[in-house]
Amino acid sequence: MPTGLQPAMLKTTGTRLAAAGAYDLVLQDYVRKNAAILDSTVFRGTLYELTVMRELHARLGVSRLRQRGAAYDGGIDITGKWDLADVPGVAPDPHEAAIPRSVRCGASRLKPLRRKILDGTARPLDVLVQCKALTTARVGGRLFRELFGAFGAFGARSKVHRNNTVLMLSSPNLLTRNGIAVMNQLELPIIYLRIGLPRIAADGSLRDGYLEHYYENAYAAALLDGCRVQRLIGLHALPL
């Protein structure tokens, strides 16, 4: 982990992009068309995935989102592109000083994304998302090991892909200390998103289901250092 970067659970309070309204319409349409199966596991899982897509777009600016949702999805529920160079207020100032050309994280050395942006060599990050609509259990290390395996099955374990891909795990619950430890042991950029379960009100409208906390593992923190993601979504550090 770069000097001065300390892992912290972050609470989000930032603004939402206007285009989130389009996803709200998709969610409402999905609920309306599936009113007969509101209690089914499949319905709730799909509803949560759609909710996560909305938050990815509205809060983080992830685009080209695609719900895989097949029986053979390889453990990846959503894919997308994250062009941080194109998000207002995120890309570094061209005159910003002390942007290293490489940093060490564990046994690996990588080029920070902000350096690539300044060099003109950055391309949108590939985003691979796994959704876990858990209702009770906190998120432990096992799920991150499974995510690591899903990344390998997706055919992206080479160094080139690793440094241009961000893995995200989304769940309504908090991380355990074991979950945090395992996350930081894995030399892959991993972000944990705590996104609440959407709630269907008596009138059929949707409530809740918002991005509440955001956590980068050590590798992701090194890759994204200085990209001002915290500024984008309005983050406040919470003790782990």
Swiss-Prot record:
Keywords for the protein's UniProt record, in alphabetical order: Mitochondrion
Keyword Mitochondrion: yes
GO CC annotations on file: mitochondrion
Localization (cell): Mitochondrion
Protein family membership: Belongs to the RRG7 family.
Name of this chain's protein: Required for respiratory growth protein 7, mitochondrial
Protein species of origin: Eremothecium gossypii (strain ATCC 10895 / CBS 109.51 / FGSC 9923 / NRRL Y-1056) (Yeast)
